[in-house]
Curated annotation (Swiss-Prot):
Keywords: Leader peptide, Pyrimidine biosynthesis. This is pyr operon leader peptide. It comes from the Bacteria. The gene is pyrL. One of its GO terms (biological process) is pyrimidine nucleotide biosynthetic process. It comes from Serratia marcescens.
Length: 37
């Protein structure tokens, strides 16, 4: 799962400015922590 988050965050970083990428990344982290595996 951590690799997934890392990969997605890198992809978003390439496309969007940090300001647009950070909230999405945090939301993704929150979801991965709260979601039952």
């Amino acid at each position: 799962m951590k690799n997934d988050v890392c990969f997605v965050s890198r992809n978003r970083q390439n496309r969007l400015p940090i300001g647009g990428q950070l909230p999405l990344f945090l939301l993704l982290l929150n979801r991965s922590f709260q979601a039952p595996h």
